[in-house]
UniProtKB/Swiss-Prot annotation:
Protein name: Acetylglutamate kinase
E.C. numbers: 2.7.2.8
GN (gene name): argB
GO cellular component: cytoplasm
Record-level GO BP terms: arginine biosynthetic process via ornithine; L-arginine biosynthetic process
Protein role: Catalyzes the ATP-dependent phosphorylation of N-acetyl-L-glutamate.
Catalytic activity: N-acetyl-L-glutamate + ATP = N-acetyl-L-glutamyl 5-phosphate + ADP
Organism from which the protein derives: Cutibacterium acnes (strain DSM 16379 / KPA171202) (Propionibacterium acnes)
Binding site for substrate: 76-77, 98, 203
Keyword ATP-binding tagged: yes
Localization of this protein: Cytoplasm
Classification via InterPro entries: AceGlu_kinase-like_sf, AcgluKinase_fam, ArgB, Asp/Glu/Uridylate_kinase, Glu/AcGlu_kinase, NAGK-C
Length: 310
């Protein structure tokens, strides 16, 4: 039997002890997720703050190093807005929503693939050549169809905006099997009702793209980085932050949530309904939020789980 002695520790020893406790807490979660696929939506402040960018890259490399199969799907809203302003690209708004014209689409494509994706790949590959940047256009990775946006009962044409209708899972799985980390920009080729390419490219929301990819792969977990701490029962009361919820409880809860919380809650529920074991919204403003969510018992945001999740 080992006795724990009450020995006073200096600052260095205390810090070392805390680090060892973190590693011990992580061990069962490392074993649980080893060999499993985790899809991460990269967005919010984590994309624009250099310190948070590096922390996110560190987290992804750590996940891969312990045998997890991460996939990153990234947005780029702040960078796209900055480039549109800098290039003086004409932008039209309908009912407060930005229309993706062909001119805007060119900026979206350039920023997501050539800027945001490349920067993240470079940060990850500073450790080892692990990450491969790509878009939905590459090798038929994603197929999309134009979105139907309804505002106040009226259908609004938002231009070149789409929803994912198909994922080339064989391509993604082959990359994961080779030890690669796919870093995906969700610009995707449009297909018609018969699945034939139209020659047009659509801008797809990163949240919905990440959810579609996680569903297609039946991922173990989907994690979405945002600029909020999670889902609140009563926004913005911090005491009502929901740490964990079953799919059935979340389904019953959604009609009672505030308008700002409902889309986030619905995104988690959609992932679970599509076969993902658990889905979480975490605060991307916290350094290493991804590791805290995956490798600690309490996590750091709101996790929704299937009703039979163990």
């Amino acid at each position: 039997m080992t006795l724990a002695l009450d020995i006073p520790l200096n600052d260095t020893q205390f810090s070392a002890q805390r680090k060892s406790e973190v590693l011990v807490e992580a061990l069962p979660w490392i074993r649980r997720f080893q060999g499993r696929t985790v899809v991460v939506k990269y967005g919010g402040n984590a994309m624009v703050d250099p310190g948070l960018q590096q922390a996110f890259a560190d987290d992804i490399v750590f996940m891969a190093s312990v045998g997890i199969r991460p996939i990153v799907v990234h947005g780029g809203g702040p960078q796209i807005n900055a480039m549109l302003a800098e290039s003086a690209t004409p932008v039209e708004f309908r009912n407060g929503l930005r229309v993706t014209s062909p001119e805007v689409m060119e900026v979206v494509r350039m920023v997501l693939v050539g800027q945001v994706g490349r920067q993240l790949v470079n940060r990850i590959n500073a450790y080892a050549p692990l990450a491969a940047g790509m878009s939905g256009e590459d090798s038929g990775l994603l197929s999309a169809r134009k979105s139907r946006v309804i505002v106040d009962g009226e259908q609004i044409d938002m231009g070149l905006v789409g929803d994912i209708v198909d994922v080339n899972i064989d391509l993604v799985i082959s990359m994961l099997d080779r030890g690669q980390i796919p870093v995906i920009a969700p610009v995707s080729p449009e297909v018609d009702a018969a699945g034939r390419p139209t020659g047009q490219v659509l801008n797809v929301n990163a949240d919905t793209a990440a959810t579609a990819i996680a569903q297609a792969l039946r991922a173990e977990k989907l994690v979405m980085l945002t600029n909020v701490a999670g889902i609140y029962g009563t926004w913005p009361d911090p005491h009502t932050l929901i740490s964990e919820v079953s799919a059935s409880d979340l389904r019953a809860m959604i009609p009672r949530l505030g308008e700002g919380m409902r889309p986030k809650a619905q995104a988690l529920l959609d992932a679970i309904d599509g076969g993902v074991s658990s889905a979480a919204i975490v605060d991307g403003r916290i350094e290493h939020a991804l590791l805290l969510e995956i490798f600690t018992t309490r996590g750091v945001g709101t996790m929704a789980r299937s009703d039979d999740y163990v």
